[in-house]
Structure formats: C-alpha cells, structure tokens
Amino acid sequence: MTSQVNAVPTDSLAARLARPELLSLEPYQSARRIGGSGEIWVNANESPFNRTGIDGANRYPECQPPGLIAAYAAYAGVAAHELVCGRGADEAIELLIRTFCVPGQDSIGIFSPTYGMYAISAATFNVAVNTLPLAEDFSLPDDISALTGSKLVFVCNPNNPTGTLLPLGEIARVAKTFPNALVVVDEAYIEFAHNADGSPAQSATSLMAEFENLVILRTLSKAFGLAGARCGFLLAKPSVCELVMRVIAPYPVPVPVSVIAEKALSVMGIAQMRADVVLLNKQGARLALALTEAGLSVLPSGGNYVLAFSNDVEVLARALTKAGIVARRYSHPRLKDAIRISYASEQQTDSIIEAIGRIDSK
C-alpha cells in the first residue's frame, strides 16, 4: 500500500505561491517510502551484498531519516514536521525555486552583494532575479519595496561574503514588507554570530510562529565541520515542507551522511561544535587585528571569515599566494578592493598573520 500525499491547506500561503501543477502532483513513491515489514527485502532492486563494512550501505536510505530529523529538530527548536533534510543548503535553495517559481514567469529577490548561488540557481531554472543593493555599510536599505513581486526573497544572515549580521527586527521587517512572498533566511553561519554584548545571536526560528512566510536554511558544513558530507536543512511551516517534499529526490541523504550527521548532533557532538566555534572566533579576532594593523579596513563579521578592504588589495593577495595561502577575491564592483579570509586553526592563523606582516598597506 502506498503512502498518501499529505494535503496542503488551500488557504495557506504556500498553496497560493506554489507552482499550480504541484498541488495535485503525486510524488514518486520509492520502495522506501512505500515501506512494509518482513525478513527478506526484494522490493527495490538492491544488492543483498554489503561489502563496505558500513551498516545499510547496500540498501536505499530513508528519504528523511527519522533519527536525523529528530536530532536536528531538537537542536534547532522546531517540530519534526517543520523540517526537510537535503544535500546541503544549496539543494534547499534549488528545491524552493523549483517548488514555487514558474520558469519564464516568476522571479526571486536578493540583496547584493550576497551568496552567489541564489541567482545562479534561479538562472538555471529560467527564473528572473531582482537585485537590490545593500546600504553603504552593507546593512539593508531603508526602502526594500523594490523587490515586491518576487516569489522568494533571500536574506543571507550573517551575510556571505560581508559577514554582516542583521538583528531580528530587520528580518521581521522583510517578512512584513513581503507578505505575499516566502522570505528565505540563510543561516549557514549563525553558530558563529554574536551580538554586540557577546551573547550568541538569536536565530530567526524564533519568528517562525509569527510569520507564515518565513523559511530558514541551515547547514552542517560550517560550524559542525561537515562540508564534505553535504547535509543541510530547510525549516518552514508544514505546508511549505510538504510541497518541497513533492519535488525532492527519493534518496537525498546517503546512509553514511546520516550516521555522521546524527553523531554530530549528539550531546557530545554539539558540545564539540560549540568549543570549535569559540576557538575559531578567537583566531578570527587575531586575524582581524592583524589585518587592521596592516592598514586594511575590516568589516565586523558574524561568520567564520573576515572581509578586508584595501586600495591595493593585490599586495596582500600576492603575499598570501606566495606563502601558499588561498583566500577569496570577488568580481563584484563593490568588492573589487576586498579579500575574504576564512577562520583557520591557530597554526594556520600564525602563518596567515606572518604573511600579512610582510606587506605594508598603509
């Protein structure tokens, strides 16, 4: 017996915004979704042989591994049915565009400069991109109404690559300004962010009960140190999650990834992550100070990186390259004099600071 498609309330914002054909779409019913009970499993054309030593590697995984979903829901403070797991936050970006944007008709909105995959993902699906420049200090402009009409409005917080952290009041302002759009808050770096008083920055999950149009993206790539595992999460109202589940691939979370991710989300794993964040933020402060003392202008950062500006940034770029250090430059006009350097280990930071010390940007 196949599992039933969960109904999406027709009066929900998600139903009004979704691509019309998805409201009646019967998603692919994989063998794992159909389920069943028994001793011998021959319903999915799998191999009976497991030659890897990894338990379950020869079997298709659950689309949404229950243990992983429960672990991240507990960590994020949301209900399990308000969560979708996929191959990093990048997949969540694509899933949202595929679910809610009609190619050649709809558009997304972004505040620039920001993470490039919002625009790239939209372009690959023939979805237009409405762009609004950030203010001079890279905060949100006072008037953001120019993005009205966008189906999805992306807000990277902390912003990549500037590191700018928006207060929750600004996130609420965006949600209020665009009641007929989904406001997607990308919190890939939220674990690194702190308020001016040193307290941890509050996640926009605290606004989910108030705003039906709020979607939050999270990842295990940054603070949890699992970039190679590709595991991310979409947090939203159940109606949004249900529609996204109609377009997601049958098996987005490989068995080894699920095992690694659940371990990272254990009590010990979370404690280790928080300890790592403290260490990395300490090295980031050292890095920012060294750059400032070398005459560069460094933006306050809520991420695990610093963005530094110099009229002769090429001098620093060459010094880093000569020392075998690979940093990030940008082609965006507002970032042509900038370089982004990720936080590193103490020993690596020593090497970066040594390379910075060889330049004179003053």
UniProtKB/Swiss-Prot annotation:
Xref: NCBIfam families: hisC
Gene: hisC
Family statement: Belongs to the class-II pyridoxal-phosphate-dependent aminotransferase family. Histidinol-phosphate aminotransferase subfamily.
SUPFAM superfamilies attached to this UniProt entry: PLP-dependent transferases
Keyword Amino-acid biosynthesis applies: yes
Reaction it catalyzes: L-histidinol phosphate + 2-oxoglutarate = 3-(imidazol-4-yl)-2-oxopropyl phosphate + L-glutamate
Subunit structure: Homodimer.
InterPro entries, alphabetized: Aminotrans_II_pyridoxalP_BS (IPR001917), Aminotransferase_I/II_large (IPR004839), HisP_aminotrans (IPR005861), PyrdxlP-dep_Trfase (IPR015424), PyrdxlP-dep_Trfase_major (IPR015421), PyrdxlP-dep_Trfase_small (IPR015422)
Required co-factors: pyridoxal 5'-phosphate
Biological or metabolic pathway of the protein: Amino-acid biosynthesis; L-histidine biosynthesis; L-histidine from 5-phospho-alpha-D-ribose 1-diphosphate: step 7/9
Amino-acid biosynthesis listed as a keyword: yes
One Gene Ontology MF term: histidinol-phosphate transaminase activity
Modified residue annotations for N6-(pyridoxal phosphate)lysine: 222
Source species taxonomy: Bacteria, Pseudomonadati, Pseudomonadota, Gammaproteobacteria, Alteromonadales
Keywords: Amino-acid biosynthesis, Aminotransferase, Histidine biosynthesis, Pyridoxal phosphate, Transferase
Pfam family, one: Aminotran_1_2
GO terms for biological process, alphabetical: L-histidine biosynthetic process
Protein name (Swiss-Prot/TrEMBL): Histidinol-phosphate aminotransferase
Enzyme Commission code(s) on record: 2.6.1.9
Source species: Shewanella amazonensis (strain ATCC BAA-1098 / SB2B)
Organism superkingdom: Bacteria
